[in-house]
Amino acid sequence: MQHAKPARRTHRRLLTPPLAQKNGIDPIQLVLPHPEELPEALAPGGRAPATIANYLIARFYPNDPQIIHSRFETGEVRLDDGTVLTTSSPYAPGERIWYFRELADEPELPSDMPVLYEDEHVLAIDKPHFLPTTPRGSYIAQTALTKLRVREGNPLLIPIHRLDRPTAGVLLFAKTVQARRPFQMMFQHRLVSKTYRAVAPVPADPTAAEQALSAEGLRVRSHIQKVRDVLQVRQLSETECVARGVEPNTLTTARILETFTPDPADAEAWGVEPGRPWGLYDLAPHTGKTHQLRAHLNLLGAPILGDVLYPRVLPDGPDRSEHPLQLLAYTLSFKHPITGEPISLRSGRTLGAWERKNSAVREAS
């Protein structure tokens, strides 16, 4: 009995696309599945589609075949070696093709990305809230990567690390193919010092609050696991880890630099109970798990202001531009892996919720 081969869509191999970028967007690559991998509707009786065009139309655009036809008409469906395919090109299982996806309408997102540092190897920018780092899901053109490739005229740009879409702050991009690996290894080996700023309630637990307000800060440990297709991470507190015999895999040092009790209207606007003091947090992650900082402050009973995932997932809706996640990638320091120069970067952005404190002080005076 022959087992079906798994469907394959390649992503990570460093192949040279046979199509140039279009408006900062790379073509996608797709390995044509074997008939036994396809549903009956695409391979009736176990027979492969007659042509590549038939397959692409049936799988992706059955209601608008002209989208695929137009790609073939403009020579924008190709093999690895650059061979231009036509609507009559036969379907060959295992063959890799390249083409441009059809872009859906995307809402216009912020484009202000001031340059914090640049040399011939690397570009550091100050990312705004709500702008994704890379194309993903419904955001393709409206991403930092796509916008920067167009703005800088550099199709080779790739991010060295990532920030969540709601998070603002310092973000690095490699400018050349040769620079990618040294900078990626720098992050992989944790040769980077990072701090974040956040605005969140002061922990209700007096001991946790006292430690967070101390010069040493509060060390938060937990075990975090990202579950596929689940928006929140799964997290065990340090106490739960001990009880279950599980090793913590995350560590953050959280220090509260200042506190401020907002007026009731501000508290209500941010979804925080009135009368509870807020803190300006300095967060130093010693590990780099998904949503680590957001999950750790939520674990303290002090979720970051503007968080739509913690403590509960809020319904989808338009971005709340007046109330973004109050999390900022504030500083990034490292020894340049190519030149050896010490580099220290700092975001020029501020957190809007904390600016309310400053405006309240000005109004009072």
Predicted regions and their residues:
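RNA pseudouridine synthases
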Residues: 1-365
